[in-house]
């Protein structure tokens, strides 16, 4: 899996159709140029972020391969690779940096807004590798969050199962009442890292209740609100537009982690980025 940047934002308005034929020809030419630039940039990104591991992906239990190609499988780093290296391509770095918001009022972020290291994580509540990350790695990062070194910002990439978008909508609904991370913990605690959980409105309401969401009627309404649905759709489309196709995927300051990695690998990456930021 690789990240590839979208076409330059200045090309966003090229979809308008001028009345004059000469203007239409110019528009078509610019679109062709934009597409060629996007292809070249995508090749650069693929080269920059291609995983260095040479082993075949392993499943959560070493005996079962997740069925979805959109999940980023565990790949053992090379013997020399104990952390994710910093990206070097300026264009890729610009994309990575633009994904960080540092919004103090973001209900789906935890950690100080001015923390030296920000991890932007693209995840899916039905992804077994995301479940492994939530169960095994995130608890090992608690001291870094509480100590002010690390901030985590969540992004939805809801695509593993047909009910992944509904679960993502439920996450937003929980966040509207200040209980996103409690909901996140409840969902992943109940998930089996060997499988792909399917969700219903009722099962998500039950999880919201476990997470302490105070107004469950509002939770259900927000979960099904068209604004929430559109937010999840747009988040997934945005991830795809910058080339993120699988989960989990993490941007950690100037580095990127493609797929599940053990806690030591993630902590080493954070430590290196913190030192670089100091």
Regions found by a protein language model. Give the residues of each.
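Conserved S/T- and glycine-rich ATP-binding loop of Class I adenylate-forming
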Residues: 119, 127, 250
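A short beta-strand-turn-helix
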Residues: 99-117
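C-terminal cap of thioredoxin/glutaredoxin-like
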Residues: 2-68, 75-77, 209-278
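N-proximal helix/coil linker or "cap" segments that precede and/or mark the start of modular domains
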Residues: 54, 70-95
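Processing junctions and N-termini across compartments
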Residues: 121-124, 244
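Short clusters of hydrophobic/aromatic residues that line enzyme substrate/ligand-binding pockets
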Residues: 109-110, 199, 223, 257
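A structure-centric signal for secondary-structure junctions around beta-strands
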Residues: 104, 116, 167, 246-247
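Structural alpha/beta surface segment adjacent to cysteine/selenocysteine redox centers
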Residues: 115, 123-125, 131-209
């Amino acid at each position: 899996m690789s990240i590839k940047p979208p076409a330059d934002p200045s090309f966003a308005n090229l979809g308008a159709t001028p009345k004059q034929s000469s203007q239409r020809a110019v528009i078509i030419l610019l679109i062709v140029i934009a597409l060629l630039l996007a292809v070249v940039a995508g090749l650069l990104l693929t080269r920059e972020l291609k995983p260095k591991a040479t082993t075949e992906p392993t499943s959560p239990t070493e005996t079962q391969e997740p069925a979805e190609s959109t999940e980023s499988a565990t790949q053992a780093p090379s013997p020399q690779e104990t952390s994710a290296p910093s990206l070097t391509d300026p264009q890729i770095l610009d994309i990575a940096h633009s994904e960080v918001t540092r919004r103090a009022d973001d209900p789906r972020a935890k950690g100080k807004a001015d923390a030296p290291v920000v991890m932007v994580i693209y995840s899916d509540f039905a992804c077994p590798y995301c479940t492994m990350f939530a169960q095994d790695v995130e608890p090992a990062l608690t001291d870094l969050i509480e100590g002010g070194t690390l901030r985590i910002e969540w992004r939805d990439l809801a695509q593993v199962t047909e009910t992944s978008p509904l679960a993502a909508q439920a996450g937003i609904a929980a966040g509207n009442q200040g209980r996103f991370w409690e909901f996140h913990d409840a969902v992943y605690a109940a998930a089996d890292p060997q499988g792909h959980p399917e969700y219903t409105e009722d099962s998500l309401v039950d999880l919201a209740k476990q997470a302490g969401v105070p107004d469950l009627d509002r939770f259900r309404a927000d979960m099904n609100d068209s604004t929430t649905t559109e937010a999840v759709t747009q988040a997934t489309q945005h991830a795809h537009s910058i080339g993120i196709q699988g989960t989990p995927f993490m941007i950690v300051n100037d580095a990127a982690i493609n797929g599940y990695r053990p806690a030591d690998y993630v902590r080493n990456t954070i430590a290196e980025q913190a030192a670089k930021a100091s």
